[in-house]
């Protein structure tokens, strides 16, 4: 009986390492599976957070680019406004030079004063043109976008509504009217 018990014990002793080994392998397998699941969860969590951060980055970058463009546009508009304001301030000076030239030319077209005023006016108009400021043409056709009719006169030479005389030169800045030309137009009854 003792032998039987010893044999059974030996038999169990031999099975015990196999059982432990099998139990350890099962436990390791379960731990690996749990670790894999945790790793998968961590990876999913990381990918989700990465995606969120990337989307935030893209939004912030787009906002930054929009602000940058808006600032450039505002800067450009401020510069345009400054040029326009300077041009408006120069118009009375140009008018005075034109008046002086007209008076000097009536007295003596060949005088040094007349020639000097002509050269000054030419240079001034060149500078203004370089910066987008130019005189409004006053041909025969009256255009309310560019001309301001301040009086009507009888004219045998001009048709009704045509420009007879330019009383004050008009100017535009990059196509936009700074000051309309003051003109008289024909009115024939």
Swiss-Prot record:
Keywords: Chaperone, Cytoplasm, Stress response. SUPFAM superfamilies: Coiled-coil domain of nucleotide exchange factor GrpE, Head domain of nucleotide exchange factor GrpE. One of its GO terms (cellular component) is cytosol. Its main location: cytoplasm. GO terms for molecular function: adenyl-nucleotide exchange factor activity; protein homodimerization activity; protein-folding chaperone binding; unfolded protein binding. It comes from the Bacteria. One of its GO terms (biological process) is protein folding. It is found in: Cytoplasm. Coiled coil: none annotated. InterPro entries: GrpE, GrpE_coiled_coil, GrpE_head. Participates actively in the response to hyperosmotic and heat shock by preventing the aggregation of stress-denatured proteins, in association with DnaK and GrpE. It is the nucleotide exchange factor for DnaK and may function as a thermosensor. Unfolded proteins bind initially to DnaJ; upon interaction with the DnaJ-bound protein, DnaK hydrolyzes its bound ATP, resulting in the formation of a stable complex. GrpE releases ADP from DnaK; ATP binding to DnaK triggers the release of the substrate protein, thus completing the reaction cycle. Homodimer. HAMAP family: GrpE. Belongs to the GrpE family. PANTHER family: GRPE PROTEIN, GRPE PROTEIN HOMOLOG, MITOCHONDRIAL. This is Protein GrpE.
């Amino acid at each position: 009986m003792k032998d039987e018990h010893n044999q059974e014990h030996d038999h169990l002793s031999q099975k015990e390492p196999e059982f432990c080994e099998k139990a350890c392998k099962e436990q390791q397998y379960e731990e690996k599976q749990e670790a894999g699941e945790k790793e998968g969860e961590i990876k999913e969590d990381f990918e989700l957070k990465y995606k969120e951060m990337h989307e935030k980055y893209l939004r912030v970058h787009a906002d930054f680019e929009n602000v940058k463009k808006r600032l450039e546009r505002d800067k450009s508009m401020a510069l345009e406004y400054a040029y326009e304001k300077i041009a408006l301030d120069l118009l009375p000076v140009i008018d005075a030079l034109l008046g002086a030239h007209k008076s000097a030319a009536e007295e003596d077209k060949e005088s040094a004063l007349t020639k000097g005023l002509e050269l000054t006016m030419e240079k001034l108009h060149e500078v203004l043109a370089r910066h987008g400021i130019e005189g409004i043409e006053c041909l025969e056709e009256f255009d309310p976008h560019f001309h301001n009719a301040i009086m009507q006169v009888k004219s045998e030479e001009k048709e009704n509504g045509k420009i007879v005389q330019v009383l004050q030169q008009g100017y535009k800045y990059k196509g936009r009217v700074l000051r309309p030309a003051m003109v008289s137009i024909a009115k024939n009854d």
